[in-house]
């Protein structure tokens, strides 16, 4: 539970630091005497760096340990937040937002690497679901927190002071209690790390100290640092086509958050910043619920599919490899449908200024779908590359942030050309197309597995899926 709590807290600041900025955009535009389109560039730049940075930092975590990289990420984030709270020029704000994103962005991918260290495929979905749910709570509720801070202190600087204080408390807690989980350093949790920065106070407690037996046979062999490792995974045909719909779902959610902060303050709603913030609250709660539910569903459907596979091929000498890809991606059907429905309703209701209830309900559908997709795809990527869990999930982070940056950058022009209803209908149409790509990948993988039958264990081979023994000693 301690591990889940720490990873959730660290990830919360990563997801919250983007939407917490949205309610401040009108205030910042006036303060820096610029235009909304220019101010929006700081949002785009943040998302770009949030997507690119993990491909480097997460790779470091896979090779040199999770704990040191996480602590360094939080420290960089805190320094950037303090600096932003003191800046008085726009260009410096934009640059520091990039530093902020590069600092905290990798922790989401590194958290997934931890899941690969401590969980088996059978229970990985539940672990990822809980952690991702609390982490994505920041994406859903960040706007409300930002609005409340501006309303209370009447200053956009309060947002970054709040982030610095919250992340600072998390850094202290993580320094003392975050354990190292990399199997290249601690094996199955029975080995004391060599370096001080990799040691947490937990290993000196009697409950955990008695588990230390220095079983070096559980250590994984060190590998050379490969800067291109995440990109090699990213550009695999199966992975790339799978990430496309997940990235678009997140981008659609980001665009939704932007439109809420922009259009609810205008006629005919005329909401205050605080009232707009409350509109974000249901999304945050729905993210948490959806991620936990999808995590439990992933675990259940994995066990169901594996039992069905074992029953079917119990007496067979030659059998296809277990299709874990299909077991993970099948659960995305319902979230995909909810996203399409939510986007169409949200766009046209906001376009025709319908009752706020319709906007809230549709935004909940969008948030639930996006968070469910992220949890399912994170689990799938760790299943496929458990020894490079951070690097593999940084691919999802790269895809979703780059797509979010793209659509945030062109959003104003899209709305000017097609209107709100047309813009979100187009997004729904793109979701349908990319969801069909995912269906194609599932069918293609299933066909390939049937055509390449072999004597195997009920998991895929090492270059596709590597089942990792459960590391119970690392889960306080």
Question: Each predicted region: which residue ranges?
Answer:
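Central mid-sequence intracellular linker of multi-pass
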Residues: 1, 124-126, 151-240, 292-312, ...
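Cytoplasmic helix-loop-helix junction between adjacent transmembrane helices
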Residues: 96-136
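Helix-breaking motifs and short loop linkers at transmembrane-helix boundaries and internal kinks
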Residues: 17, 32-33, 56, 64-65, ...
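C-terminal transmembrane bundle
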Residues: 15, 44-47, 69, 82-85, ...
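Short hydrophobic/alpha-helical segments at membrane-entry points of transmembrane helices
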Residues: 89-97, 109, 159-160, 242, ...
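Cytosolic juxtamembrane N-terminal segment immediately preceding the first transmembrane helix
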Residues: 1-17, 26, 30, 468-473
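Glycine-rich segments within core transmembrane alpha-helices of 12-TM secondary carriers
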Residues: 123-153, 161, 165-170, 283-291, ...
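Conserved MFS/SLC helix-loop-helix module at the cytosolic interface between two early adjacent transmembrane helices
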Residues: 51-91
């Amino acid at each position: 539970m301690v591990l889940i709590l720490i990873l959730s807290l660290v990830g919360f600041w990563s997801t919250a630091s983007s939407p917490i900025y949205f309610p401040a955009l009108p205030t910042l535009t006036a303060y820096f005497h610029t235009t909304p389109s220019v101010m929006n560039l700081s949002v785009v730049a943040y998302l770009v760096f949030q997507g690119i940075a993990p491909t480097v930092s997460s790779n470091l975590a896979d090779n040199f340990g999770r704990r040191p990289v996480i602590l360094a990420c939080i420290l960089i984030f805190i320094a950037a937040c303090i600096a932003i709270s003191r800046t008085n020029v726009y260009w410096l704000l934009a640059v520091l937002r990039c530093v902020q994103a590069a600092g905290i962005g990798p922790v989401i991918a590194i958290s997934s690497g931890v899941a690969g260290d401590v969980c088996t495929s059978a229970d990985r979905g539940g672990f990822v679901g809980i952690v991702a749910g609390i982490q994505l709570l920041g994406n859903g509720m960040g706007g409300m927190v930002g609005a409340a801070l501006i309303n209370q202190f009447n200053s956009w600087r309060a947002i970054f002071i709040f982030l610095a204080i919250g992340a600072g408390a998390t850094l202290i807690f993580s320094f003392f209690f975050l354990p190292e989980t990399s199997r290249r350093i601690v094996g199955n949790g029975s080995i004391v790390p060599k370096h001080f920065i990799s040691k947490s106070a937990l290993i000196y407690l009697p409950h955990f100290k008695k588990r230390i037996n220095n079983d070096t046979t559980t250590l994984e062999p060190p590998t050379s640092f490969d800067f291109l490792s995440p990109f090699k995974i990213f550009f695999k045909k199966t992975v790339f086509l799978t990430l496309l719909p997940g990235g678009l779902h997140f981008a659609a959610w980001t665009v939704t958050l932007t439109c809420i902060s922009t259009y609810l303050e205008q006629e005919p709603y005329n909401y205050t910043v605080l009232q707009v913030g409350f509109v974000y609250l249901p999304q945050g709660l729905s993210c948490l619920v959806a991620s936990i539910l999808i995590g439990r569903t992933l675990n259940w459907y994995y066990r169901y599919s594996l039992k069905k596979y074992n029953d079917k091929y119990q007496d067979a000498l030659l059998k296809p490899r277990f299709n874990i890809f299909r077991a993970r991606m099948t659960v995305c059907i319902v979230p995909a449908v909810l996203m399409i429905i939510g986007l169409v309703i949200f766009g046209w209701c906001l376009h025709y200024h319908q009752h706020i209830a319709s906007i809230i309900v549709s935004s909940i559908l969008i948030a639930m779908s996006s968070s469910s997709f992220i949890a399912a795809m994170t689990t799938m990527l760790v299943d496929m590359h458990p020894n490079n869990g951070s690097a593999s999930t940084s691919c999802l982070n790269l895809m979703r942030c780059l797509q979010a940056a793209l659509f945030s950058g062109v959003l104003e022009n899209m709305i000017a050309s097609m209107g709100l209803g047309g813009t979100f209908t187009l997004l729904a149409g793109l979701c349908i197309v990319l969801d069909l790509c995912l269906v194609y990948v599932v069918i293609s993988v299933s066909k390939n597995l049937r055509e390449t039958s072999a004597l195997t264990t009920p998991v895929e081979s090492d270059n596709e899926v590597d089942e990792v023994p459960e590391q119970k000693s690392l889960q306080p």
